[in-house]
Amino acid sequence: MRKGLKRIGALLIAGIVVSAAFAGCGGSTAAGSSAAKSSAAAGSSAAAGSSAATKKTITVAATPTPHGEILAKAKEILAKSGITLDIKEFTDYVQPNNVVDAGEIDCNYFQHQPYLDDFNAKNKTKLVSIAAIHYEPLGIYAGKTKAIDQLKDGATIAVPNDSTNEARALLLLEANGIIKLKEGAGVAATVQDIVENKKNIKVMEFAAEQVSRHIDEVDLVVLNGNYALNAGLNASKDALTIEAADSAAAKTYANVIVVKEGNEKNEAINELVKVLKSDEIKNYIKDSYKGAVVPMD
């Protein structure tokens, strides 16, 4: 009887040991599984964090031609670095500045420095340029009159009406002997500064984007490079004359990337600038626009 009890006790003890061993294995497996899941989750989280850290989006306001086209090329290059470029196109010269000033868009690309300075002064905005990208020669194009020396008394010439581009247009007319401006008028010139007008030329002022629409109604038009392109014209082959590529105008009126004050060191925007100043983009501009748009060094 005692031997039987001892045998049963031994079996019970063995069973308990075996059960404990299995319980230990089970607990270790569950803990290992939990740890693996935790590790996997942490790894997944780290990967997501890394992805979020490298993923950047830049929104830029631009006029369609050539700015939007140049940006579209830059977009392809930036995508290789994990940067998304969201291009918002505008057809006027006011809204692109307003949306950047309001913080709705990161930067813009459509204007030159004198226009920006004038806009800031008149609108009390704090926008700053961070890079000069290209220059668009202003040109005189034929309307009803096909050559400058064929202008008759009382001829009409359409020019942009914003202060900086109008001054630029008037300086180009003066450079070609059509009018003479008051000494020292320079980049602040207006039609009131015309002191000599032997052929009684009528200077007609229109919004920059509307000048080309009047080409069949006037004798000559003075067009910004981008609006000439929009009208199917090319400064290098269609213009009667253009601003010299080595002139002060080329430096003064280079088109710039603009941000709201305080965003000058934005990493993603500076990556955009780096691409726009690259040889790849410079060659794209030269090949695409044949002199109508000139990349800046």
Where are these regions (language model features)?
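Short, well-ordered beta-strand elements
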Residues: T54-T65, I83-E89, T156-I157
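Ligand-binding "clamshell"
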Residues: D118-I130, K144-T145, E217, V222, ...
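Short, low-complexity disordered leader/linker segments with a strong preference
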Residues: M1-T57
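Periplasmic-binding protein-like
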Residues: N165-E174, L276-M296
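Short helix-initiation/N-cap motifs at beta->coil->alpha
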Residues: I87-N98, G186-R213
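A bilobed periplasmic-binding-protein/Venus flytrap-type ligand-binding module shared by bacterial periplasmic
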Residues: P137-I148, Y253-N266
